[in-house]
Amino acid sequence: MSYTLAAAYPSLGRHLPKLDLATLPTPATMHLLHLDTGSFEVAVKHDEATSNVYGGNKVRKLEFLLHRARDRGAQRIATFGAVGSNHALATAIHAADENLECTCFLSHQKGTPKIPFTLNMHRRIGTEIVPWGRGIEPLSLYREYLQGRNCWVIPLGGTCWLGSVGFINAGFELARQIADGAVPKPARIYIAAGTTGSVAGLVTGLAAARIDTEVHAIQVAD
């Protein structure tokens, strides 16, 4: 059983180059969950350990997206999110590590304790922050900040077919860990869902690796 789509399908993999930003495979461990209704075994895939730098499982997408940007000769990355967006900050940090400038279009969100940390990190690494969202005319904003700047745009949450390849790999990775006996084949998998690119990729990867299980997407953003 292969760990990645490229290993399983080499001819396809040659057309999907990526940067080495992630520490993979991430661990999969078993735990006993005690509830009033009884005790249950649950497996946990520790994708919080995907990057030693920052970003959790967002880095699975960024490996492919930032490689494509560099391959196309971009000098600046632009992406979108709320002011506390983990995706936006992860993109800015890893873009900076690849000597790419970054513009983040950030929209309002309800205050959380993490927002000051996130904004301070953006300032430390020199992210260009542009207010974005309701009441702002987007086309004029894009012309002002993107036109003529040799910019590569990464969609909200990194969700696009190329970003989802990172989670197709996650499906193959989990299938290999099941085959190796690290965890049993789960009856169902729960995954956080925002823009759902990770969900689409994981479902595709599990199907390609012939892991027959239910995938439940849990909404974490409005």
Q: What are the residue ranges of the model-derived segments?
A:
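PLP-dependent amino-acid enzyme catalytic core
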Residues: M1-D222
